């Protein structure tokens, strides 16, 4: 797993929730979703308990909790068969 990779939780209280890998060490990956687990307190997960979606977020999309929430909401919509919302900046 690499930093910025989008994963889905397979086990635990956060099962089926999307998150972004914000760090790794020898035994664990650290996952944030911007709401339940913010950048300041990431969720420590066993790598066997998450599955990669083969999507990596750009650094500006994962710069803050609000950016994480927006990016994950777009991906959640795509997984449900929706379309990507385009936001004006």
Regions found by a protein language model. Give the residues of each.
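Ferredoxin-like alpha/beta domains used as RNA- or RNAP-binding modules
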Residues: 1-3, 10, 20-89
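Short, charged beta-turn/beta-strand-edge "cap" motif at the junction between a beta-strand
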Residues: 12-15
């Amino acid at each position: 797993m690499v930093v910025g990779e989008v994963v889905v939780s397979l086990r635990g209280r956060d099962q089926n929730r999307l998150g972004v890998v914000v760090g790794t060490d020898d035994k664990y990956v650290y996952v944030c979703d911007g709401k339940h687990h913010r950048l300041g307190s990431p969720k420590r997960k066993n790598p066997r308990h998450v599955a990669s979606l083969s999507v990596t977020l750009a650094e500006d999309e994962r710069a803050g909790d609000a950016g994480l929430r927006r990016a994950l909401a777009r991906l959640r919509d795509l997984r449900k068969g929706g379309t990507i919302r385009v936001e004006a900046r």
